[in-house]
UniProtKB/Swiss-Prot annotation:
The keyword Transit peptide does not apply. This is Long-chain-fatty-acid--CoA ligase 5. One of its GO terms (biological process) is positive regulation of long-chain fatty acid import across plasma membrane. Its cofactor is Mg(2+). One of its GO terms (molecular function) is ATP binding. Changing residue 453 to K: In DIAR13; loss of oleoyl-CoA ligase activity; does not affect localization to mitochondrion; does not affect localization to endoplasmic reticulum.
Length: 683
């Protein structure tokens, strides 16, 4: 007993004391620096609840009131930007760079002032401060795009984005449909397209073109011959400064943008989006992640996804509402990695196509068995931490395996949001493990202003698109033709809320097809409520067709399954009502096909491999195997395929600007090959 007393209360030797203090300091340092888990704030087994009428809402939404805004002083996009100016204390707003140079920044006040000057110029040129006054914006992502858009909002006008890749016919359609008299564009080349349409008598309403980039006198003179005034953006802003008008801010219910959707068939439809639509969607995102991620003026987003798409518009609304910054890529997607390393963004909006490319590159670099083993072990270890809510990028595996990937995206990413297309479980799991940041998946479409469901913080499972956002309800409706019934928690996804658009511009027939009499938006997607209350997109109602024997076919569902085949980069599944079977056009993966063929004992150039019968039959066999494993019925399997060496792309007219297959164009383009495949089957 005396020994214990002496041990406890006798002075310790200096070395022992130092050891104890060092150990204590280490424990204290670990306690204050250890990663704080991002834990769910609700029961992940019960993420949404039913309400009257068969719809569902997120369980965190305590009442049935739908979110319309996050901040009382930011109910329109004009107010959102002014709030950003205030909370950032006129901090940096829009960043741009030239090759091999750092980013240069325009402050919030500079952007606001330039928007007021440009808007004043529009009024001086005869435009009115009215939500039925449409201004075209025909440019790639850059600061002047935002200045042009904000100029519209500052004076209650409506922005009408034109896609870079829409093509001349669609541009004619949009200019005429929206009766656009003025277009703000970036390059002389685009101005020539617009002038050419006027010269041919296609777009008589167009009277003024404002150009961001320098242009020569020849362009101006050519425009004048067609009755078009050509102005530089610099001169337009100076003109507006001389004839300044006070801002005429819009109301939340006023139109903000006409977003023309890239239809897979027919002319683009102009979705009428209000200020409240955009603000409510951005507010719902902030509400969804409020305890896990709170944007600050120190945050930076990279802008490379088209500003003509609502996904990118919502991201930027979130950024400006919190006084954060947006850095624009140089305009060349091949330089995006360099832009990100320079910008070091904290918010990274992404699409599966880009993430898949990064994922494939990492997988291909892990060539040896040891590298593959270490990569798999690293992902598994990090994902186990993630399941406990621990998100970090300073672990042993980060330093050994993932640092290079993180650095390629700038090394500071806090949040990745992916949308626009389904994300595979393997890719989602990889990025959640590798990036050491929060990775969320969103689902929606233009007509609901970009998003209607979102995965929740703390739920790091994959294979679903989350729960309804606080700005909308979601319900399913029976699709009897496809054997989907709500009694089985399956059906067409329908949306109602403050984010649902007002209809299609001057197209009541298409509007009635999309919006029913009760205000529900019918998406054309087939969803399933999972037991935990999350939504899974399982099929597509549109683009279905019937085979000769009466069986309904949803080709996109089949294509999504076949895309899991390693040698397949793209696939188009085709069927006809007078035919009893399906055929397909496959674009092989240039990185995979040579090794795939080598295992079959076949060598040659990529084009030669595409023409090789042994290779073609092996790929067909692989497709049918994957289809069977995935539950495809016999009539849903392709019976013959053609291997095409050139990818489907926007440039060759086979994909829409949102990278969806133009099924009608594909059928026409491959008509000869399709007929040959059917003849082969009959033989």
């Amino acid at each position: 007993m005396l020994f214990i007393f002496n041990f406890l209360f006798s002075p310790l030797p200096t070395p022992a004391l130092i050891c104890i203090l060092t150990f204590g300091a280490a424990i204290f340092l670990w306690l204050i620096t250890r990663p704080q888990p991002v834990l769910p704030l609700l029961d992940l087994n019960n993420q949404s609840v039913g309400i009257e009428g068969g719809a569902r809402k997120g369980v965190s939404q305590k009442n049935n009131d739908l979110t319309s805004c996050c901040f009382s002083d930011a109910k329109t996009m004009y107010e959102v930007f002014q709030r950003g100016l205030a909370v950032s204390d006129n901090g940096p707003c829009l960043g741009y760079r030239k090759p091999n140079q750092p980013y240069r920044w325009l402050s919030y006040k500079q952007v606001s002032d330039r928007a007021e000057y440009l808007g004043s110029c529009l009024l001086h040129k005869g435009y009115k401060s009215s939500p039925d006054q449409f201004v075209g914006i025909f440019a790639q992502n850059r600061p002047e795009w935002i200045i042009s858009e904000l100029a519209c909002y500052t004076y209650s006008m409506v922005a009408v984005p034109l896609y870079d890749t829409l093509g001349p016919e669609a541009i004619v359609h949009i200019v005429n449909k929206a009766d656009i008299a003025m277009v703000i564009c970036d390059t002389p080349q685009k101005a020539l397209v617009l002038i050419g349409n006027v010269e041919k008598g296609f777009t008589p309403s167009l009277k003024v073109i404002i150009l961001m980039d320098p242009f020569d006198d020849d362009l101006k003179q050519r425009g004048e011959k067609s009755g078009i005034e050509i102005l530089s953006l610099y001169d337009a802003e100076n003109l507006g400064k001389e004839h300044f008008r006070k801002p005429v801010p819009p109301s939340p219910e006023d139109l903000s943008v006409i977003c023309f959707t890239s239809g897979t068939t027919g002319d683009p439809k102009g979705a009428m989006i209000t200020h409240q639509n955009i603000v409510s969607n951005a507010a719902a995102f902030l509400k969804c992640v409020e305890h896990a991620y709170e944007p600050t003026p120190d945050d930076v987003a990279i802008s490379y996804l088209p500003l003509a798409h609502m996904f990118e518009r919502i991201v930027q609304a979130v950024v400006y509402s919190c006084g954060a910054r947006v850095g624009f890529f140089q305009g060349d997607i091949r330089l995006l990695a360099d832009d990100m390393k320079t910008l070091k963004p904290t918010l990274f909006p992404a699409v599966p196509r880009l993430l898949n490319r990064i994922y494939d590159k990492v997988q291909n670099e892990a060539k040896t068995p040891l590298k593959k083993f270490l990569l798999k072990l690293a992902v598994s270890s990090k994902f186990k931490e993630l399941q406990k809510g621990i998100i970090r990028h300073d672990s042993f595996w980060d330093k050994l395996i993932f640092a290079k990937i993180q650095d390629s995206l700038g090394g500071r990413v806090r949040v990745i949001v992916t949308g626009a297309a389904p994300m595979s479980t393997s890719v989602m799991t990889f990025f959640r493990a590798a990036m050491g940041c929060q990775v969320y998946e969103a689902y929606g479409q233009t007509e609901c202003t970009g998003g209607c469901t979102f995965t929740l913080p703390g739920d790091w499972t994959s294979g679903h698109v989350g729960v309804p956002l606080a700005c909308n309800y979601v319900k399913l409706e029976d699709v009897a033709d496809m054997n989907y019934f709500t009694v089985n928690n399956e059906g067409e996804v329908c949306i109602k809320g403050t984010n649902v658009f007002k209809g299609y511009l001057k197209d009541p027939e298409k509007t009635q097809e999309a919006l029913d009499s009760d205000g529900w938006l019918h998406t054309g997607d087939i969803g399933r409520w999972l037991p935990n209350g999350t939504l899974k997109i399982i099929d597509r109602k549109k683009n279905i067709f019937k085979l000769a024997q009466g069986e309904y076919i949803a080709p996109e569902k089949i294509e999504n399954i076949y895309n899991r085949s390693q040698p397949v980069l793209q696939i188009f599944v085709h069927g006809e009502s007078l035919r009893s079977s399906l055929v397909g056009v496959v674009v092989p993966d240039t990185d995979v096909l040579p090794s795939f063929a080598a295992k079959l004992g076949v060598k040659g150039s990529f084009e030669e491999l595409c023409q090789n019968q042994v290779v073609r039959e092996a790929i067909l066999e692989d497709l049918q195997k994957i289809g069977k494993e995935s539950g495809l019925k016999t009539f849903e399997q392709v019976k013959a395929i053609f291997l095409h060496p050139e990818p489907f792309s926007i440039e060759n007219g086979l994909l829409t600007p949102t990278l969806k297959a133009k099924r009608g164009e594909l059928s026409k383009y491959f008509r000869t090959q399709i007929d040959s495949l059917y003849e082969h089957i009959q033989d």
